[in-house]
Structures are given as C-alpha cells and as structure tokens.
Amino acid sequence: MADFNQILTTGDVDGGIINVVNEIPAGSNHKIEWNRKLAAFQLDRVEPAIFAKPTNYGFIPQTLDEDGDELDVLLVTEQPLATGVFLEARVIGVMKFVDDGEVDDKIVCVPADDRNNGNAYKTLADLPQQLIKQIEFHFNHYKDLKKAGTTKVESWGDAEEAKKVIKESIERWNKQA
C-alpha cells in the first residue's frame, strides 16, 4: 500500500481545497484507522451499530492534530466512499471537538467537484440542519457505552477557522518530520 503521507500533499489550504484520504465509509461502524508506521489501514475496533459514522471519515496527509494523529476530516457525500479513496475536497468548516480531554478537531468538507449537487455546499449553513444534528449527536455520544461523558462537540467554525486549524496541524507535522 502507498504511504499517503509520502505521495500526497495537504493541498491548497489557502484556496480552500485539500487532499483527503478516506478511512471510514459513511454508515460504517468499523473504526478503521490509518497506521502511519505500517502505511496501512487497520481495523481498530467495531463500534455498536447505533454509532455508525454519519459521514465519511478520513484525514489530511502531512498534518498532525493535537492528539498526535493526522487531522481528521468529515467528508459529506451522498454515497459512502471506500476506505483508501483519496480526493480533493473543499473546506466548509470545522467541528471543534474534545475527546477524553484532548483536542481532536474535525475539518468538514465536501468533494471539490460535485456535479450531482451542483457544488451547492459552500458553508456549514448550506448543509441540512438534520445532518449537523446527527454529526453532533454521534460525536457527543459514540463513547457513552464504554465511558460516558468523555467526548464533547464544543462549537462549529467557518472555513477560515478550519484553514487556521489545518495550518497549525501542518506546522506540527513539519516539526516532527
């Protein structure tokens, strides 16, 4: 398998277009993670079916969030994307998130070229409010059966705030490289 951190860049962050590697298809309860040391995808665990991911879930190559992993992405598409698919995506916002006391923000994005929706999603406000509620509920509760109260969606930010989070994660990546 190719090492996505070697073959892909982060993309054009200032232009709002980033490279994304998908780990978990929307609707899956399999917690699949990119293992950076092995340059391979690994099944970390199987979550309860009620906590299937409401969106595709992936990462931005050559970034590190404060939790030590690549910066996470919530990728909104109409159909699930397979594990290992990579694409250019347009940044529309950020979900500010804390997991067990650690910052674990999620960049919200859509495919950069979505001809089915006419590229209708340009901001978080363009997304269906029910989807935002589902995402927030999922991340506030997906660990409740194991350790209740350890996750919290703190706030939502716009694309400019998301770009700032991405740039900070690029700096962390560059420091460890």
From Swiss-Prot:
Predominant location category: cytoplasm
Keyword rRNA processing: no
InterPro entries: Pyrophosphatase (IPR008162), Pyrophosphatase_sf (IPR036649)
Binding-site positions, Mg(2+) 1: 67, 72, 104
GO biological processes: phosphate-containing compound metabolic process
UniProt: substrate binding residues: 31, 45, 57, 142
Organism name: Neisseria meningitidis serogroup A / serotype 4A (strain DSM 15465 / Z2491)
UniProt KW rRNA-binding keyword: no
One GO CC term, this protein: cytoplasm
Name the record gives this protein: Inorganic pyrophosphatase
Record's subunit section: Homohexamer.
